[in-house]
């Protein structure tokens, strides 16, 4: 009871994402996590090896899902969510822009073609968002879909970025965010509170 009351009070002061979606869509909208079978350039040797020090692959969408089609994953995830009937397809695991644009287009299209999908959330690194990917995301935005580019910033301090083995600097994040905003894309920044340094 107390926690619910506190959240209700907080919603009066803060524009929370879930509340914003409910206001705009007239009903609850839930993110359904997807595994696109992507890798990460900080794991496969393109940028580095071993990944970021904090990366916990087990926290991503169920690894078993990567062998299911996008449609099957969405149906499975939707069955787990009782309170929502509209969804955002959330490409979360690894680096969800680390593929050829044709591959991304196919995956994103499979997602938005499913019933009750109102948009895409694409989790990625700021150094893995070339112009062609931004343009692809704009295509979906221009078709009326809710599109969020979710960038893993983690920290704005270059020393800490190096310490956690990110493989990019803060300036890279700033450039990518600027390019996304110039195209009218919404950006969600992922931060880790309490990193050393």
Locate each region found by the language model.
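Short, surface-exposed connector motifs at secondary-structure boundaries
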Residues: 114-120, 186-189
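Distinct, well-ordered alpha-helical segments
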Residues: 101-109, 130-141, 161
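Acidic (Asp/Glu)-rich catalytic clusters
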Residues: 82, 109-115, 137-146, 181-182
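Basic, amphipathic alpha-helical patches used to engage nucleic acids or provide basic targeting signals
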Residues: 174-180
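Core AdoMet radical
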Residues: 57-73, 77, 81-101, 116-129, ...
């Amino acid at each position: 009871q107390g926690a619910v009351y506190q959240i209700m009070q907080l919603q009066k002061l803060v524009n929370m994402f879930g509340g914003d979606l409910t206001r705009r869509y007239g009903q609850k909208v839930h993110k359904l996590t997807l595994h696109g079978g992507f890798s990460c350039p900080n794991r496969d040797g393109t940028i580095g090896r071993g990944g970021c020090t904090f990366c916990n692959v087990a926290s991503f969408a169920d690894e078993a899902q990567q062998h299911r089609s996008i449609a099957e994953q969405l149906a499975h995830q939707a069955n787990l969510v009782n309170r929502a009937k509209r969804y955002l397809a959330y490409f979360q695991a690894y680096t969800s822009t680390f593929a050829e644009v044709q591959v991304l287009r196919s995956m994103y299209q499979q997602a938005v073609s499913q019933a009750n999908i109102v948009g895409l959330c694409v989790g990625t690194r700021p150094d893995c968002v070339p112009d062609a990917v931004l343009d692809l995301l704009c295509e979906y935005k221009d078709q009326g879909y809710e599109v969020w580019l979710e960038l893993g910033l983690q920290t704005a301090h270059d020393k800490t970025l190096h310490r956690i083995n990110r493989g990019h600097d803060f300036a890279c994040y700033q450039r990518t965010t600027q390019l996304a905003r110039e195209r009218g894309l919404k950006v969600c920044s992922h931060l880790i509170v309490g990193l050393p340094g």
